[in-house]
Amino acid sequence: MQLHEQIANISVTFNDIPRSDHSMTPTELCYFDDFATTLVVDSVLNFTTHKMSKKRRYLYQDEYRTARTVMKTFREQRDWTNAIYGLLTLRSVSHFLSKLPPNKLFEFRDHIVRFLNMFILDSGYTIQECKRYSQEGHQGAKLVSTGVWSRGDKIERLSGVVCLLSSEDEDSILAQEGSDFSVMYSTRKRCSTLWLGPGAYINHDCRPTCEFVSHGSTAHIRVLRDMVPGDEITCFYGSEFFGPNNIDCECCTCEKNMNGAFSYLRGNENAEPIISEKKTKYELRSRS
């Protein structure tokens, strides 16, 4: 069967909420995620969001324009099949897929579907530009609620994809500056795990609205505090993620309480920011 026939078939036979298990290796997940964020997220936000391989170009300019058109149509018409087929038949994507075994075509397609869920009304959330964080040059992304959520709810169409990392994998993945956003330490498994997928866009807050719940090779998001449309979906990365006692934390709660990176504001409106000694890496965020 020719590749385009395979793409046509997998664009029809799919679940709009992909299975929670997967067989991706850490390297495959990095490439699949970079492609998915380029095709789906970047083409909507119109800037480059986080990437595991920052020097790689995934699409040519004409393909990027096509991806933007595909995503615009998807957001208007919610036609999953046309969106999947339109994205997977782009030259650069097809060339990448031609090197994969058949079972990995399904894995790649499912990863695209995870991100397409960001723009489905039923998902109850979406992605928006975020200019809060200096580590991102004040141009990043955030996930926000588009519906009403109650404590204990599971955000069904929002997930993270998890891969266990060997020490060799960890050294390779963390070699690139800024790629540590994607790595968490599992206290239960006592090892580092690669954390990508839509859930990787969840920002930290010291008073989070949600939490990560791990189950096997994925993690879902559970609501901790009631949310209404416009509320940001946030999780707690850890007490030392942004330096000792999160001294460099720039979250909304720290700004409100004048803690973390905003502690210089206490009692002195004219004070200058205190620049702590910067490390090349933040600490790994933790999960159970």
Curated annotation (Swiss-Prot):
Disruption phenotype: Mutant animals exhibit a lack of di- and trimethylation (H4K20me2/me3) and an increase of monomethylation of 'Lys-20' (H4K20me1) of histone H4 on autosomes, leading to equal H4K20me1 levels on autosomes relative to X chromosomes. Decreased expression of autosomal genes. Increase in 'Lys-16' acetylation of histone H4 (H4K16ac) on hermaphrodite X chromosomes. Increase in binding of the RNA Pol II large subunit ama-1 on X chromosome gene promoters relative to autosomes. In a dpy-21 mutant background, RNAi-mediated knockdown leads to embryonic lethality. CDD domains: SET_Suv4-20-like. It catalyses: N(6)-methyl-L-lysyl(20)-[histone H4] + S-adenosyl-L-methionine = N(6),N(6)-dimethyl-L-lysyl(20)-[histone H4] + S-adenosyl-L-homocysteine + H(+); N(6),N(6)-dimethyl-L-lysyl(20)-[histone H4] + S-adenosyl-L-methionine = N(6),N(6),N(6)-trimethyl-L-lysyl(20)-[histone H4] + S-adenosyl-L-homocysteine + H(+). Residues 128-238 form the SET domain. GO terms for molecular function: histone H4K20me methyltransferase activity. GO terms for cellular component: chromosome; nucleus. InterPro entries: Hist-Lys_N-MTase_N, SET_dom, SET_dom_sf, Suv4-20/Set9, Suv4-20_animal. GO terms for biological process: determination of adult lifespan; methylation. It comes from the Eukaryota. Keywords: Chromatin regulator, Chromosome, Methyltransferase, Nucleus, Repressor, S-adenosyl-L-methionine, Transcription, Transcription regulation, Transferase. Its EC number is 2.1.1.362. Transmembrane segments: none annotated. It is found in: Nucleus; Chromosome. Its main location: nucleus. Histone methyltransferase that specifically di- and trimethylates 'Lys-20' of histone H4 (H4K20me2/me3). H4 'Lys-20' trimethylation represents a specific tag for epigenetic transcriptional repression. Contributes to dosage compensation of X chromosome-relative to autosome-linked gene expression, possibly by converting H4K20me1 to H4K20m2/me3 on autosomes. Involved in the regulation of growth and body fat metabolism downstream of the TOR complex 2 pathway. Belongs to the class V-like SAM-binding methyltransferase superfamily. Histone-lysine methyltransferase family. Suvar4-20 subfamily. This is Histone-lysine N-methyltransferase Suv4-20. It comes from Caenorhabditis elegans.
